[in-house]
């Protein structure tokens, strides 16, 4: 986590809050350690808190649930529930009154509730976890393939592209494909799927990698 922050030109002490989406180790692993070490406020659902089962003493711990909004400095953070195999998973949009950033990873489907929560985003980070053919041909056991592709799993490249097509692109200026599987996807496959929807629209398409993430983006509203 610290290395990734450093790549973005930040230090852990620069953080105003840490928001945990759910309890799976690849999402919550370093959050408590950083929060304790640098006295950073934590936000998560109560279900995530219960599932983590850790000692949060000495940490400013805040709970949020579907539909809640809370402030972090000048940003309004809005929580919404998603379809994932976790206790009480959430995703978030962030709004400063001028521009809105939405994030959607770790969901096996896009419900009308999710679509409404992500309305009027200027930038969207969306999960492109796997290529369907790569997953089908992978060495993963059958049960794991079913878990990944279920409605409580992850979005494929095609699912992400389908959502973008149905959701509309009128306000979007940046789309970031994220949470790519290292075994069942390739950045170029994710980008091709999104590019096919974007077409000739003036929208920047970026694919985040597990190693490098993505660079800072300046957002402006309509």
Name the predicted role of every residue range:
Residues 16-23, 43-46, 102-105, 125-127, ...:
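Active-site neighborhood of phospho(di)ester-bond hydrolases with catalytic His/Asp-centered motifs
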Residues 46-51, 65-67, 210-212:
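Short, polar loop motifs at secondary-structure junctions
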Residues 43, 62-65, 78, 206-208:
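General small-molecule cofactor/ligand-binding pocket signal
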Residues 112-209:
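Cap/insert and terminal regions of metallo-dependent hydrolase folds
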Residues 24-28, 49-51, 86-87, 110-112, ...:
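Active-site environment of divalent metal-dependent phosphoester hydrolases
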Residues 2-7, 29, 64-123, 216-222:
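Core dinuclear metal-dependent hydrolase active-site scaffold
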Residues 29-38, 54-55, 185-192:
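Metal-dependent catalytic neighborhoods of phosphoester/phosphodiester hydrolases
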Residues 1-44:
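Active-site metal-binding motif and surrounding structural segment of the metallo-beta-lactamase
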């Amino acid at each position: 986590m610290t290395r990734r922050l450093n790549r973005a030109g930040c230090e852990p002490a620069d953080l105003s809050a840490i928001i945990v989406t759910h309890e799976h180790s690849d999402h919550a692993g370093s959050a408590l350690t950083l929060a304790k070490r640098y006295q950073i406020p934590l936000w998560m659902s109560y279900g995530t808190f219960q599932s983590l089962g850790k000692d949060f003493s000495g940490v400013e711990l805040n709970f949020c649930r579907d539909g809640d909004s809370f402030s972090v400095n000048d940003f309004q953070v809005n929580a919404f529930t998603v379809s994932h195999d976790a206790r009480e998973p959430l995703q978030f949009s962030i709004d400063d009154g001028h521009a809105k950033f939405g994030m959607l990873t770790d969901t096996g489907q896009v419900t009308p509730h999710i679509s409404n929560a992500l309305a009027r985003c200027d930038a969207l980070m969306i999960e492109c976890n796997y290529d369907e053919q790569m997953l089908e041909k992978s060495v993963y056991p059958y049960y794991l393939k079913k878990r990944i592709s279920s409605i409580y799993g992850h979005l494929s490249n095609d699912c992400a592209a389908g959502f973008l097509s149905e959701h509309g692109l009128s306000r979007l200026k940046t789309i970031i494909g994220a949470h790519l599987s290292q075994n069942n996807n390739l950045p170029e496959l994710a980008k091709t799927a999104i590019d096919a929807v974007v077409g000739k629209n003036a929208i920047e398409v970026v694919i985040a990698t597990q190693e490098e993430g993505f660079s800072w983006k300046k957002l402006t509203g309509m």
